[in-house]
């Protein structure tokens, strides 16, 4: 019985180390989302901080369209980060599922 507990503790510690490493890698990650066939692009970090916005000058005359495309590009980048985070955290937890509603990184 004690051997099982010790083994579980070792596995938990290794998983924690893997999670921390994955979080550090995600923080360095930069992802670009785009919209309007590339007329707008938004680059976010893994922490979802905006690093760059590129807007094709041809859409600036239509404010509503520009706003919609910026939002769509941001959402595209955000979704890519979520997918990458899920993949990396899944690898770090060895596929162990988290309870519903719990997201990583915490």
Swiss-Prot record:
Gene3D superfamilies registered for this protein in UniProt: Nucleoid-associated protein YbaB-like domain
One Pfam family here: YbaB_DNA_bd
Extent of the signal sequence: none
Family annotation (InterPro entries): YbaB-like_sf (IPR036894), YbaB/EbfC (IPR004401)
Keywords of this entry: Cytoplasm, DNA-binding
Subcellular location: Cytoplasm, Nucleoid
Primary residence: cytoplasm
Region (Disordered): 82-106
GO molecular function, one term: DNA binding
GO cellular component: bacterial nucleoid; cytosol
Function: Binds to DNA and alters its conformation. May be involved in regulation of gene expression, nucleoid organization and DNA protection.
Assembly notes: Homodimer.
Family: Belongs to the YbaB/EbfC family.
Protein name: Nucleoid-associated protein XCC1002
Source organism of this protein record: Xanthomonas campestris pv. campestris (strain ATCC 33913 / DSM 3586 / NCPPB 528 / LMG 568 / P 25)
Classification lineage: Bacteria, Pseudomonadati, Pseudomonadota, Gammaproteobacteria, Lysobacterales
